Amino acid sequence: MELVIISGRSGSGKSVALRALEDVGYYCVDNLPFPLIAELASFLLASDCSAVVSLDIRNFPENLTRIDELLHQLSQLTINTKMIFLDCESATLIRRYSDSRRLHPLSNQDLSLASAIELENTLLDPLRQQADYLIDTTHSSPHELAANLRHILRGSTEKELNIVFESFGFKYGLSADADYVFDVRFLPNPHWHAELRAMTGLEQPVIDFLERQTEVHNFIYQTRNYLETWLPMLEKNNRSYLTIAFGCTGGKHRSVFITEQLAKYFQSRGKNVKIRHRSLEKYHKKT
């Protein structure tokens, strides 16, 4: 359980940082009023969860000694606190604001954009000095910033990919959220064996039947190799979920068995795997 404070110059990537850390499981709060940060820390301590809060010029305390007081208060709570400051060259910030056409938070003080950026830099310097980590985002893409933050906080630059293996029946329609769809209707069908018809791909007689089929083994082997070849690229693509769907006619036998086999294989390789049987859920509701 920890509290991460993200601060830095406006336009340096704080919003990107919050989205990236929310994707890896942190509870994120944007621009929480400064007096409430200690209350949030107490809540986290009681609930045993981790959070990220942004602190910028809009909620910066006028009395700078309050920052020291807050950090001391957090240390008394025995909460693991990290402060990360995002910096960026002024010329790059000017270009980013020109491209986005957004107003700088200090622009309402009758300052030019360049003057507002330099004033903010001066005001934030005490916070920069307190930071545990300083990240210069001048030449960083959003993906590179996200990877840098994951490395600092999780020890790994890669975002954990959640892989969903799901089965479905074509007669109920295609899986709407699937990234990959494999049609297994060409495989031997247990439905045509009266003693197996009422069963599902989770039951041993159906499993035994499908395991005896050479075509089934070949399909599993070749599909497994295909996925193993391209999963590393997908994991580097900064995505949170990958849904791989297998469809047979009714979503009751073949697709269920294939889904289970491949899900268990990748689970045994340390992947974060979930299994979903869409049409099987319909079947159980009917019965």
From Swiss-Prot:
Transmembrane regions listed in the UniProt entry: none
Any one GO MF annotation of this record: GTP binding
InterPro entries: P-loop_NTPase, RapZ-like, RapZ-like_N, RapZ_C
Protein keywords: ATP-binding, GTP-binding, Nucleotide-binding
Residues bound to GTP: 56-59
Annotated positions binding ATP: 8-15
One Pfam family from the record: RapZ-like_N
Family recorded in the similarity comment: Belongs to the RapZ-like family.
Family annotation (PANTHER family): RNASE ADAPTER PROTEIN RAPZ
Biological role stated in the UniProt entry: Displays ATPase and GTPase activities.
Official protein name in the record: Nucleotide-binding protein HD_0584
Protein's organism: Haemophilus ducreyi (strain 35000HP / ATCC 700724)
Lineage, highest ranks first: Bacteria, Pseudomonadati, Pseudomonadota, Gammaproteobacteria, Pasteurellales
